Amino acid sequence: MGNINSICLNNNGKYRIDSISCSLEGCKLNSKELVENMVALVDKYPLTQLLIIRECKLKQIPVNITNLSNLSELILSDNKLSQLPWSLPPPFKPNTLLSMASITNENLVRLDLSNNRFTEFPSSVFVLPNLKQLILCNNQLTNMNVTLCGGTSNNNGAHQPHIACQLEELKLSNNNFTIFPSIIGDQLTTLKSLDLSGNTITSLPNSFSNLVSLTSLNLKSNKFTCFPPSLCTLDKLVHLNLSCNQILVSPSDHTLGVSLLPSLEKLELQHNRFAHFPMDILEIVSLRVLKLQDNDIDKIPDKIGNLLNLNELFLSENKITQLPSTIGELINLRKLYLEYNKIGSLPQEFSKLSKLNILILHNNDLKFVPDQLHSLSQLLRLSLDENQLSSSDQKLIKSEGSLALIKRKNKLNYGSTMNGTGTTSSSGSASTSTHGSINKTTDILLSSVTLNNSILNQINNNNNNNNNNNNNNNNNNNSSNNNSGTNSLSSTPNGTGKSKKKLTHLTISRSLFRGNSSNLESEKEDFINKKQQQQQQQQQQQQQQQQQQQQQQQQQQQQQQQQQQLGSTASPSTASPITSHITVNSTVLDFEDDIQKMQLGLEALSNLETSIGSNNSGGGDSMNGSGGNINNSGGSGSGCGTISGSTTKQRRGSVFLPPTNAFKLSPNVVSSSYNTLPASVMSGLLQQQNLENGGVGSGSGSGSPIISANSICNSNSSSSNSLLKPPIINTTNLSTSPNLLSQSSTSFLNLPPLNQSSTNSFLPPQHQHHHHHSNLSQSLSINNLAHRLPTSLSSSSLSSNNTYDSLQFQQQQQHHHHNHNNHQNSNQPLATIVPSFSKFKNSFDQLLEEQDFSKKKRETLQKLSKEQKWNLLLQYRNSTLNMLNMKEHSNNSNNNQSIKNSTIIASTTTTTTTNGESLDGSSIQQQITKNSNFQSSRFYIDNLTSKTDISLVKEVHDFLKESGPEVSIFIGMGGIESLLGILQFNLDNAQLQFDEEKVGYCLLCLKILVECTAKSVITTNNSLNLVTMFLTSASKYIIDIIIDIYDELLRLQVIGVSVVLDSLINFQKVKGLSSPYVPLVALLRNPIIEMPTKTTVFKIINFLIYSFSVLEERFSVICSLLKVGILEVIGMFRALPHTSYSLRFELDLFEEVLDSDESELVKKIGRKEVLKRMSNEDNDLSKQSSKQSMDFVRVVMVSAGYGDLKIDLDERTSYANVIDFIQSNYQIKYSIDRYGLFVPAIGSLVLDGSILQSSGSQSRWVDPSKSLIDNGLSNEIVEFKMKPMQIQVLQSVVVVVATNHQKEDIIKEFTIDPQLKCFEIVQYLRTRLDSSSPAFQRKISVLTEDEDEDYESDIYGVYCFSSLESYDQGSWYPLNSRFLDFNPTNTPTIIDVKLMERPLRVLFSGTEKLMKFNPYVPVSELIKEIKNEIHLKINIEDYGISYVPNVSSSNLSSLIIEETWLDPTKTLLDHNDMKCSVVQFKFKPRTVSVMVLVESGIEIPTTDTPYQFVNTNSISEIIEKICTPHQLNPLSHSLYISDCQGQKIKLLSRQNCLRDQQVNNGDHLIITSKQKDLPSDFNVWDEPNDSSETITYSKDRRVSSVTLNKLIEKLTSPEYTQDSEMKTIFLSSYRSIITPSVLLSKLMERHTIPTLVDKERGKLIQRKTRLLIKSWLELETTKNREEVITLLVQNMPAQSIEDDGLKELTELFVDLSTKSYSSILPIVIGELPKCKIPKIIDSYVTFADMDEIEIARQLSLLTFPLYSRIETSELLNQRWSKPGGGPNIMSVVGLFNKISNWVSFTIVNQPKLRDRAVVYGKMVKIANAFYELRNYHLLMAIISGLNASPVLRLKYTKGKLSKNLKDNLDTLEELMSTQSSMKNYRADLAAASPPAIPFMGFHLSDLVFIDEGNQQLCDSRINFKKLEMYKKTIATLQNFSLFPYQFTPVPIIQNYFLDYKIVADKPIYEMSLSAEPRNAERYDIQ
């Protein structure tokens, strides 16, 4: 392939070769060379399967192409072919049988000959035996006369050619056919797809009906005038295109003639002449897509509602004025295009189109926004432009888009508030609405999904306030929103106030006890460590109990065996191992069948029955029939509940191994329910996080709820690697930046185990690193619940071998934040950011093609302006256009990996990147060309087929990740459809040709597209349904990708939920499952799925639940999940030894909504009815008709963590039988004696004030002494739950003994439900304890209307201790945990209800931190704790704690609220008005004592008594206090800091206070006369207002002169608009007037804001000051910058916690002093110019041997480093003329003198005239080379050497020069002429582009003139015009110093000049005289 490589280097084109494919495009070789290289290509790669030669002007194909025996696809489009190499030589006998193998490519399947020059049909293609697809579009064919293929003659003597192939697809579009080719209907009967568009055919022959296999027919743009009747016989036709013809509708019956097309799904009839809607179309009920645009239809018939399957309807460019009401019956319609009609309104029924995604209504006659649009909750694209709407509506549409207009009207249900009652029906009808029926639940899934906007707002507010909710961690434990049965937040319509909240039980994990351990691991450890002895006793007791239970089980088993031997009547398959009196009804196992189906996957369905039978034996509804134990192939790990013995068949195709960066292009911020969590849940979650991190109940007295590395439990299960190891969090970073908590995220690299189960996805060791998007990032922060993206995210340090380094992690976070913002703002129009037309031209052309506008309309649209075209494009593709504004990027380091399985032979595109920064410090945006490794979008679209090689699919994956704007074009061209086509092919051929790797990469591509533009994927037909079908895959990686896609989709409000539910329901129907949630639960139980993926699955489940706003609908979904075994899965996850925080979070969230909804529904319909819904009663009723009726009892065990159990009763079934059965078949954590059977009451719940009595008089506990029938339980439902327990409570009361009040401790007993949480116990006991108890030490406040909940309840807790003597050794129970979790064995303990540590949000230095304080200690101790927490060296006496008292909103208008300081001597409890306040730890004003001295001459008596001033008083106030008593004018005096002798040290600024100027107790001040103050002493803030004394302007209003202080003021003023230019001028030349230290001191003065200045304005000034400092460093040159950095380090600001900007200034100083600066910008170019190395003889080179151009290059390389090192300070005040003042300038000047001297010496050193002339000419050539390189400095050096007197006098030598050289020299001399101040040089330099080197001598002269011709000061003001002139000259020099020359150094040439020693002028002149003596004649010269 050497020739191919040479092609690549010398000609434009793209080449791509791998093991089986070769692509050559756009080659410019001549025909002969091209054919020769093709011959070489065929010989070199004989195994090629795909050969592409496109756009190469190929005229013939080499004959040896037939040697490619494996060739299956040959693409020769866009060439000049007219014949093929397979022609058979005539004559050819008809009956001769030939073997074609020797002359054809017998394996060729696809042949593309489009866009060539065929005038006759290439008959030879029919000799290709396996040809399936033939493309001959855009040729010049007029017929298909096939005569050269042999064949036979028919009865009529007509020749019938022999056709060896069986074509399936034939494309003949855009040829010259006038008659339909008869051979198609006669012999090509195997065709499935036929394209004859763009011809002039008028009719179809009768033989056309022979094409019985035809599924797609395209007859677009022909001359049909009626519907071809022969089409009606095509039963398999799916797609028919008859657009752009002249077909008419029958005027009588308005019919077209369409009939008998039962399979037709897509019908295209646009651009015809329909005056009426074709009525017979409405009978084709299979239609999914109907296109009728650009006709003359004015009315849509009512029967349009018949098309129930219609998905897309195109009716644009008609004359429609109204739509029929029946259009609302098109319930599956997703896309509706109605633009360019005359529609004035929409029918009411239009609102029924609930699935509508795209609605285009622009250019109609709408006069108002239709109300019907408000109900279309799934709209993704809406266009209402160019209607007759109000001007305000039109303005909003233009600026924000049509969807934004709908949202603004607050009617679209994108986030409607929940029903305040929690249900849409009365309690009477509630029981029938969601009666546990799975089918009924499925029916309402899509119609009832709404999101609660108030919840979303609440969460957003929580996140905006960072950790604000942390203060309410305990508040919300027992206080939430309980409005008539809903568990969500209610909001007032206008948002003006909050409705009053009532106390409720809702909080995180507030669930009935499920038999699971508490998830608060860190709290339990603290508690267990304090009670170690007690636990040991408990363990001993448990062991004894277990032994007793084992003995009982053995006895019961023996009894059962004996009874079975006696002839028990129970069925062997359902008999209990305990007793035969219990028969388990099999209906409870119905849903297990569905789970088993899902676990087995696609290949194991044949083994379904045996697998289910083996697992269901033994009774019970546990996951494996053995009591719910986890069977995980030898150990506990990632899976739950496997099916023993199931095997899978090995699939064909490769195994999918995802790339390491396949999962989550950027890691997500994980939350469990996206944007829909209730506020009460949110607050509970915040507390849960706090508890997890050891923040509550630790008894430490203080601490912050930050994440500690020690508080996160690593997963280290030995049996599985699927459990994630959470990251180690850098607590230092978190503690110093609390905002990090709300911004943290992480990513994980999993090491999946080598798969030993039934899957073919074996991972070799080198592929075990699997980058997963784990939800454990949730462990970092709950505050990210409302924003899963990623936004800008900060990464914590990750100490795991499986994580990326922090730099890569941050880049991924920033990238995912961008993807997330795409989702958030996808509806925002981009009209305000119109890119160049070249960027969106392709998209615009695609739009015109897609929408298929009429020719006239296209011409009109093409004439639109750029802005109008962009606006039109926005109407259709607003979800992808944001990509057009993205910068294309290329990662050079990854270029070699972009196409992993391909070798890039060549890419002739040279990428040049130029980085630069403007002089004002703003960086120029980097411009980088597209990654040349990728092909165009069109290439991928054309080649993405079911036969596509996996390498191309991988390349598409990389292309979508890295190609930016090209992705939009890829989508517009049908890229999504191409990917779905590959998936559909693999799904249809799963048993034969399933390619797992290809499927995996296609899904990865879709995942990328979902992240970038989810709406485009959603609006693609059947996309998500198809993706969901792969949930049965045996590859865990494919499952992971699908779950990631779900996760991403659910970020879209409303539509995301609907799409996911829709796909699950479709999956349910296709697979015949009983519930749409079966796939999700099956994944949770699948052992091959890893825990991070299972966590995401559970997160999806939670979000689906929370998306239902109506209580009963939500509970119906929960019940559906209960029936498919979700509780068993939860129990198994809880039992795992190491469970991630994020998974526990999801489990808690599910239990939260289950419990809260259950409790609310119990209040409405009664507990018995609720239990019925939670059970499988409906399934039993459906089967009772076929079974003999008998008594039964249904036992609901939800509270124990299981489902329900239906037991058939007989007279012998006893209470003990049931309990024993449960104990034997289920894992009940606690002693079975603590449980009982409870019979709930009938009817709604009526509370009597006790939280223990949960039902009316009919509720009761089952009597254990009676049989179940005697207990009246026949056909009843009972609940298996824990019995009440007794607790001891300490109550301290005050008694009177002999008139003395004494405290006495009393212990009382109370009965409580052990499943209660501690905060509920607090609530309960506070209503029953004596009022003198510590629980009442603080009064319960009365809620005001604007308060969210009762704040007091959160600060009371349960303090546990064993006896009064050991009271101090007790522990706090976490409020959110169950009492039973910390007292599992009911050990006798005493509890005390008292105030807990109080959490406060402390604000200091702009940072907010949650801390906890003992409410009983003085505030002074709190101040010390805060100081220790912030780790700053501050004077504690200067600081205090302040807060703003809470005031009711009704009083805000009449009160002026002032902050209050906490009294250090009091406790927190003494400050009743600081409830819910954020306290501030800040500087507290105090009095300082100073001595004031008086300067002589001032009539103020001296005194030894110190003055007392408040340190917040300004100096002007203090001067006034001193002068006023003595009748002195304060404005005439100043105040200095002095020493004790009165020596002035520093002038105090009049505007700043004592504290700002570090005046402390004992300091000395001296008051002086202001007249003696020097200008340099004035503070910037003391500068007077603008006047002629401080600033003057020129006529053009430019600054002419200005004082230093005024200049600093202007540069940092928020109002000043000319600061950018002034800043550059000043910073470039400030060293001419002041030193860097003076400038820094002035800037720090300006940054210190006086107290009296407005705070917001002060922050703006500080910000501009910091920006000025940053620009200062950026504009400094290297050495000067080092000097300034040293000053920054020496003047680092002092520590402060005030929000005074010092923290930001310190961070800036640190950043600037550690930042790396680059003075020269790198230039990325192609290959460097080839250097010309001279001949070297004995290590010596002569001048004659050196090339002139190479000399110029090497001298330029020597000059530029010297030139680029010139410092700014060297150019000011003629510093270079002073000794040592300008070393770099002198180096450049010295090189100039050396070269000039060398020129003169080299010329005169030649003894002969001829040699001198040659050298002279060579010097001219060098000078010209310097000019070409824009090295003006050395160009002038050459000219200077040539014009030196020793050379100038050599007239004979110069006379020997050629005319060209003389002219060249004259031109150069004219360019560098000094006349008119070097006008020519100035102009040429101004037009030059870098790299270049100016002539330094000229610019130094300019600087001398500037310095000497302009004074420095004008009346003590800076001459700013002089600085401006300085800047102009310096900028010219510095601009070219950034871009170096790019040549290869040649050391021997450089050393030649470096070693040259300057020769004195006198010897050179003598040599000149010797060469040409004075007055010598020509003949005297040698």
From Swiss-Prot:
<feature type="repeat" description="LRR 17">
    <location>
        <begin position="592"/>
        <end position="615"/>
    </location>
</feature>
<dbReference type="InterPro" id="IPR008937">
    <property type="entry name" value="Ras-like_GEF"/>
</dbReference>
<feature type="domain" description="N-terminal Ras-GEF">
    <location>
        <begin position="1595"/>
        <end position="1717"/>
    </location>
</feature>
<feature type="region of interest" description="Disordered">
    <location>
        <begin position="414"/>
        <end position="436"/>
    </location>
</feature>
<feature type="repeat" description="LRR 13">
    <location>
        <begin position="331"/>
        <end position="352"/>
    </location>
</feature>
<feature type="repeat" description="LRR 11">
    <location>
        <begin position="286"/>
        <end position="307"/>
    </location>
</feature>
<dbReference type="InterPro" id="IPR001611">
    <property type="entry name" value="Leu-rich_rpt"/>
</dbReference>
<dbReference type="InterPro" id="IPR016024">
    <property type="entry name" value="ARM-type_fold"/>
</dbReference>
<feature type="repeat" description="LRR 10">
    <location>
        <begin position="261"/>
        <end position="284"/>
    </location>
</feature>
<feature type="compositionally biased region" description="Gly residues">
    <location>
        <begin position="616"/>
        <end position="642"/>
    </location>
</feature>
<feature type="compositionally biased region" description="Low complexity">
    <location>
        <begin position="457"/>
        <end position="495"/>
    </location>
</feature>
<dbReference type="Pfam" id="PF13855">
    <property type="entry name" value="LRR_8"/>
</dbReference>
<feature type="topological domain" description="Cytoplasmic">
    <location>
        <begin position="1849"/>
        <end position="1982"/>
    </location>
</feature>
<keyword id="KW-0344">Guanine-nucleotide releasing factor</keyword>
<dbReference type="Pfam" id="PF00618">
    <property type="entry name" value="RasGEF_N"/>
</dbReference>
<dbReference type="Pfam" id="PF00617">
    <property type="entry name" value="RasGEF"/>
</dbReference>
<dbReference type="InterPro" id="IPR003591">
    <property type="entry name" value="Leu-rich_rpt_typical-subtyp"/>
</dbReference>
<keyword id="KW-0433">Leucine-rich repeat</keyword>
<dbReference type="Pfam" id="PF00560">
    <property type="entry name" value="LRR_1"/>
</dbReference>
<feature type="repeat" description="LRR 8">
    <location>
        <begin position="212"/>
        <end position="234"/>
    </location>
</feature>
<feature type="repeat" description="LRR 14">
    <location>
        <begin position="354"/>
        <end position="376"/>
    </location>
</feature>
<feature type="compositionally biased region" description="Polar residues">
    <location>
        <begin position="506"/>
        <end position="520"/>
    </location>
</feature>
<dbReference type="Pfam" id="PF23598">
    <property type="entry name" value="LRR_14"/>
</dbReference>
<comment type="function">
    <text>Promotes the exchange of Ras-bound GDP by GTP.</text>
</comment>
<feature type="repeat" description="LRR 2">
    <location>
        <begin position="47"/>
        <end position="68"/>
    </location>
</feature>
<feature type="domain" description="Ras-GEF">
    <location>
        <begin position="1747"/>
        <end position="1974"/>
    </location>
</feature>
<keyword id="KW-0175">Coiled coil</keyword>
<dbReference type="InterPro" id="IPR023578">
    <property type="entry name" value="Ras_GEF_dom_sf"/>
</dbReference>
<keyword id="KW-0677">Repeat</keyword>
<dbReference type="GO" id="GO:0030036">
    <property type="term" value="P:actin cytoskeleton organization"/>
</dbReference>
<feature type="repeat" description="LRR 23">
    <location>
        <begin position="1689"/>
        <end position="1712"/>
    </location>
</feature>
<dbReference type="InterPro" id="IPR001895">
    <property type="entry name" value="RASGEF_cat_dom"/>
</dbReference>
<dbReference type="InterPro" id="IPR010473">
    <property type="entry name" value="GTPase-bd"/>
</dbReference>
<keyword id="KW-0812">Transmembrane</keyword>
<dbReference type="GO" id="GO:0003779">
    <property type="term" value="F:actin binding"/>
</dbReference>
<dbReference type="InterPro" id="IPR036964">
    <property type="entry name" value="RASGEF_cat_dom_sf"/>
</dbReference>
<feature type="region of interest" description="Disordered">
    <location>
        <begin position="615"/>
        <end position="654"/>
    </location>
</feature>
<feature type="region of interest" description="Disordered">
    <location>
        <begin position="457"/>
        <end position="532"/>
    </location>
</feature>
<feature type="repeat" description="LRR 21">
    <location>
        <begin position="1075"/>
        <end position="1100"/>
    </location>
</feature>
<feature type="repeat" description="LRR 20">
    <location>
        <begin position="979"/>
        <end position="1003"/>
    </location>
</feature>
<feature type="coiled-coil region">
    <location>
        <begin position="515"/>
        <end position="567"/>
    </location>
</feature>
<dbReference type="InterPro" id="IPR011989">
    <property type="entry name" value="ARM-like"/>
</dbReference>
